[in-house]
């Protein structure tokens, strides 16, 4: 082989070696990247999850703060209960908010709720009556059909009779003798109110109506006299307060006049006593003069 051919073959081998080495490096690089890709992906996913969690935590923090603020506001709010509309049985009352009202108001109504008092309401009055019939009403609130009603006819020394009427209103015709009725208001089979009524006869009702005007006239007369006396006393007090200086001078002059009269009466009394004593003293002096003359 010639030296030129040997040099060419050596250069060719060197070139092929470099190409093989470059191919191996590229292959290793591809494998390395192929091996590292899953880890990188997993790391990227983990980082994404961490970022999502951080974002969710950042978003949840304002929500938690808002919930805390709401809870604090609910704690600050104060509730006050109004008076019940009834003194017995079942009624309604207002629930008032005394703090945190809209518009800066001192109190505002939140809701209306049911309230209850003592069960026994005693004796009630009819809602309407005439010479022939009477209408009686049970204790209830709206809606009326929420409760159950039991009407009883009360009899002395006997068991009460349960009537067929189960409504809140009972209309009764007057009889020749007075009658007594009782209504029981039930809520979930629990008695929440009872009230009794007396239904008088026609003659008794007429007698009550005839005697009522006399009583009313006496009551009106007494009230009128009382009002007049109160007005007179008020005017006298106002006059004394307005003219206090004049009133004070008047009482002072009256007091001085009384003192002068008392002094004059005391002086007259002294003069009268001195006059009464002088005749008794004169005979004593005469006796002394006679005794001296005799000596």
UniProtKB/Swiss-Prot annotation:
This is Sperm acrosome membrane-associated protein 1. One of its GO terms (cellular component) is acrosomal membrane. Detected in spermatozoa (at protein level). The modification Phosphoserine is found at residues 256, 278, 291. Residues 44-68 have a biased composition (Acidic residues). Its main location: membrane. The lineage of its organism: Eukaryota, Metazoa, Chordata, Craniata, Vertebrata. Residues 1-29 form the signal peptide.
């Amino acid at each position: 082989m010639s030296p030129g051919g040997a040099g060419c073959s050596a250069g060719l081998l060197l070139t092929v070696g470099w190409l093989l080495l470059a191919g191996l490096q590229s292959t290793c690089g591809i494998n390395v990247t192929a091996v590292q890709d899953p880890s990188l992906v997993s790391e990227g996913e983990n980082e994404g999850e961490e970022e999502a969690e951080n974002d969710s935590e950042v978003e949840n923090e304002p929500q938690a703060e808002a919930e805390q603020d709401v809870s604090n506001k609910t704690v600050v709010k104060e509730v006050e209960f109004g008076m019940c509309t009834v003194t017995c049985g079942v009624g309604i009352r207002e629930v008032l908010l005394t703090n945190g009202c809209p518009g800066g108001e001192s109190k505002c109504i939140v809701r209306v709720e049911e309230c209850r008092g003592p069960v026994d309401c005693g004796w009630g009055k009819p809602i309407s009556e005439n010479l022939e019939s009477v209408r009686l009403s049970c204790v209830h609130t709206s809606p009326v059909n929420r409760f159950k009603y039991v009407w009883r006819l009360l009899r002395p020394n006997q068991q009460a009779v349960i009537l067929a009427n189960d409504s809140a209103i009972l209309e009764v015709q007057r009889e020749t003798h007075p009658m007594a009725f009782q209504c029981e208001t039930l809520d979930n089979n629990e008695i929440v109110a009872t009230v009794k009524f007396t239904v008088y006869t026609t003659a008794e009702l007429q007698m009550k109506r005839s005697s009522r005007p006399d009583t009313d006239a006496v009551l009106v007369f007494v009230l009128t006299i009382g009002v007049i006396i109160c007005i007179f006393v008020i005017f006298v007090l106002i006059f004394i307060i307005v003219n206090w200086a004049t009133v004070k001078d008047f009482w002072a002059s009256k007091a001085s006049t009384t003192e002068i009269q008392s002094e004059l009466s005391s002086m007259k009394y002294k003069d009268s006593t001195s006059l009464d004593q002088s005749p008794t003293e004169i005979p004593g002096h005469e006796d002394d003069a006679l005794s001296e003359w005799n000596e």
